[in-house]
Amino acid sequence: MTGFATDAIHAGYEPDSLYGPINTPIYASTTFAQDGLAQLRGGYEYTRVGNPTVTALENAVAALEGAEYAVAYSSGMAAIDVALRVLLKPGDHIVVSNDAYGGTYRLIQQVFTQWGVDNTVVDMTDPEAVAAAVQDNTKVIWVETPTNPMLGIADIEAIAAVKQHAALVVDNTFASPYLQKPFELGADVVVHSTTKYI
């Protein structure tokens, strides 16, 4: 088993067998040749969907978080939007922190509310308030800890204990996997923006 520092440098990358570069190459190609119709080489077709550089990043983040897999998007807000769209549908309910990142808060209030998703805003530093906010149709509890920009700290493990049937999603942007491992504390999904500490 390797340590965090070694994983931070090497996790997720295997040198290709043709040239064996030590560092992860940056693939600048937007498209990849196919051997025939729908016969992708290495599973890559178009960089917007993925390429070997992005795959190495995804594998590294998954390894650092102790996750089975990771998916990289063009921005942290894109990752948040996708996570919520996968987990929520009209008629569902989300519990969100009263000091969540403004972009996340606006996405929930302005987009998901119009989509028919209800929300309850609570103080995530109070697990009892979180427990009281969970409803029969609650599908997501959104935790950001430390929060951006107020640096509020939520007890992920205590919230996991009261989440009931809801998915616990943790925005781990400020702490990074070096300081906090949400999956080990009961999170179901972890998101990051790589504009901070990753």
Task: Please identify what each model-predicted range represents.
Residues 18, 38-40, 49-50, 189-198:
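Active-site C-terminal subdomain of aminotransferase-like
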Residues 31-81, 103-110:
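Conserved N-terminal alpha-helix of the aminotransferase class I/II PLP-enzyme fold
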Residues 21-22, 66, 115:
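Short, basic and Ser/Thr-rich N-terminal targeting/leader segments
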Residues 4-8, 59-63, 186-188, 192:
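Short, hydrophobic/aliphatic alpha-helical segments
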Residues 10, 69-198:
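Conserved PLP-enzyme active-site core in the AAT-like
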